[in-house]
């Protein structure tokens, strides 16, 4: 499993689809709070016709990626896009998360619930993110 550079995912006709926003995780509720706000904003912006979007954490917080994938699979979701809320593709996204995804896919396949899971590149690599950060830094330094 490798990180996909393209946001496009090929879906089988009639398949149910969802997205998981994946954050690193922390035991500090103050660190977690902005992710709940972000999820609410995305859901509101996408409206009722948007792709179902959930939040998961790689470690140190709940729901875990595994729990979220299993919940979605149990609800009949057959295609999941994972959008990492990371600044760059470090060790976690290059090694740890792909191993987690592969294990989840194998477990679900063995249980008779195959799910296609697509790992996308981290949002921090998107040009809009770099532009937004640059603008904030420039504003703060003026």
Feature names for model-found ranges:
Residues 1-142:
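Active-site-proximal alpha-helix that buttresses catalytic centers in soluble enzyme cores
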